[in-house]
């Protein structure tokens, strides 16, 4: 990586946070929203191309196709970031930021990085890929800038939905960032659709909890030992208010009772939203504390 002029140390001796801050400043996109990926590419001397990896694997110059669906690649010698053609814009931007992370983080010394759905996932176990994902998210949300703006608004699911397009991020990525970085106790439960009976009503659609994200204060106050649900799956009507008509894109309110692994139960005020693929339930505050069971 080239010298970061505003840094007091060589680029390879900087921490990730220092690299992030100086990269945004020197590329001229600090506090510019959404983060301008073209300025980052230009500053780093990188070119972005779109490929159909199924038919153009020769670009990768790799002896074997990696496991999983290819989404992005960084070719250091050619100074090229390649992304899968046809990807949604938000996913494409995150993939580009992931490859930029490989380019600038000191220990990421490979001449070729090839990334799939697995390595771009928040669940990857590969250390370098976890680091690249974190740096990509920090580029997307400009470090602490997102949190600073979020804290100036109401603690609500609606706040995250409002900020998402401003930062050029998906609703899911924004809700994750919102919950995990908030200074107040809050959490989001993400439900994935299990299946749908075409002969039944939408409220009979079945969902499972895919994952949960919570702020540090939330974990300290309520569920330091983890959250447990009563069952592995539930109906849509159990997530939304059963007394109101709901639709994709509409935020609704409901209450939810959940228990810690120690079986301590809490009833929370929640807000519920669906992007058409998943359902997000934002836990705001406890309504009342029930007796231990």
Residue ranges: model-predicted function:
Residues 1-293:
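Active-site hotspot residues in diverse enzymes, especially metal/ion-binding acidic/histidine motifs
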């Amino acid at each position: 990586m080239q010298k970061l002029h505003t840094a007091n140390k060589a680029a390879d001796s900087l921490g990730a946070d220092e690299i992030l801050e100086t990269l945004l400043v020197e590329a001229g996109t600090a506090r510019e929203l959404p983060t301008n990926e073209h300025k980052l590419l230009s500053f780093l001397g990188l070119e972005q191309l779109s490929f159909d990896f199924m038919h153009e694997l020769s670009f990768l110059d790799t002896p074997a196709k990696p496991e999983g669906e290819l989404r992005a690649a960084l070719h250091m010698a050619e100074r090229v970031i390649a992304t899968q053609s046809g990807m949604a814009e938000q996913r494409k931007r995150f993939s580009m930021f992931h490859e930029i992370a490989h380019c600038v983080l000191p220990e990421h010394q490979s001449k070729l990085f090839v990334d799939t759905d697995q390595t771009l996932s928040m669940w990857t176990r590969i250390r370098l890929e976890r680091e690249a994902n974190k740096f990509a998210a920090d580029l997307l949300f400009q470090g602490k800038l997102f949190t600073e703006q979020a804290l100036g608004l109401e603690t609500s699911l609606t706040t995250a939905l409002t900020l998402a397009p401003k930062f050029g991020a998906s609703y899911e990525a924004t809700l994750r960032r919102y919950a995990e970085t908030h200074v107040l106790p809050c959490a989001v439960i993400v439900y994935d659709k299990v299946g749908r009976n075409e002969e039944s009503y939408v409220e009979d659609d079945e969902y499972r909890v895919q994952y949960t994200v919570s702020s540090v204060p939330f974990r300290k106050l309520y569920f330091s030992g983890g959250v447990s649900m009563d069952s592995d799956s539930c109906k849509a009507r159990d997530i939304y208010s059963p007394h109101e008509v709901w639709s994709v894109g509409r935020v609704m309110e409901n209450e939810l009772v959940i228990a810690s692994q120690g079986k301590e139960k809490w009833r929370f005020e929640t807000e519920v939203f669906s992007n058409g693929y998943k359902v997000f339930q934002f836990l705001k505050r406890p309504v009342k504390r029930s007796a231990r069971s």
